[in-house]
Structure formats: C-alpha cells, structure tokens
C-alpha cells in the first residue's frame, strides 16, 4: 500500500482541515450558544447566566436533532380515471 500525498489526503473527507470536522463544529456551536445564553442571562446574576447557558445548549441540541427527523409530507390525492365508470375520478 502506498502513502497518500497531501492532495489526496485533502480529498478524503476533508482530512487536514480541523475546522471542517463535524464534531468540532458541533462543539464550537454549543460553546457559542452557551456563551450567548450566558451573556443574555447575565442580568439575572449567576443563576441567570446558568439558565441562559443551559438554554443555549438545549437550543443547539434540539435544532440538531430536528434536522435529522423525518419529514412528513402528505401526498395529495389526484383524481385518477374517468368518473363515468364509477371509479370516482
């Protein structure tokens, strides 16, 4: 087996780019939302900051989970067939 060069490594799933790693993106987004929540909750003191940070983390987790949920799209009923033969088209 031969060793891959840098160009081939970059083509394989974003190797070599730590900012494109999905896990680091999730951690960065959670930390960012926790910081924003803590900043908005700062008027409530330490307790408000904790509640704000928890709300920011919860928002990130729920939005990430909602993105992976199946989409329920109803299929419209289209009349098929002629109505003169009783097919209710």
From Swiss-Prot:
**Industrial or biotech use:** When avirulent E.coli transformed with a plasmid encoding the genes necessary for microcin production, secretion and immunity is fed continuously to broiler chickens it significantly reduces the S.typhimurium load in the intestinal tract. 44 of 57 reptile-derived Salmonella strains were sensitive in in vitro killing assays to the above strain, suggesting it might be used to reduce pet-acquired Salmonellosis.
Q: Which domain of life is it from?
A: Bacteria
Which keywords does this Swiss-Prot/TrEMBL entry list?
Answer: Antibiotic, Antimicrobial, Bacteriocin, Plasmid, Secreted, Signal, Virulence
Which cellular compartments is it found in?
Answer: Secreted
Identify this protein by name. Answer: Microcin N
Q: Which residues form the signal peptide?
A: 1-15
* Major localization class: secreted
User: What family, per the record?
Assistant: Belongs to the class IIa microcin family.
Biological role stated in the UniProt entry? Active against E.coli and Salmonella, but not Listeria or Campylobacter. Channel-forming microcin. Probably neutralized by its immunity protein McnI.
The PTM entry states:
Mass spectrometry suggests 3 of the 4 Met residues of the mature peptide are oxidized.
Thermal properties? Stable on heating to 80 degrees Celsius for 30 minutes, unstable at 100 degrees Celsius and to autoclaving.
Please give the GO cellular component terms listed in this UniProt entry. Answer: extracellular region
BP terms from Gene Ontology: defense response to bacterium; killing of cells of another organism
Give the induction note.
Answer: Induced during exponential growth in all media tested; activity remains in stationary phase, although expression varies depending on the growth medium (at protein level).
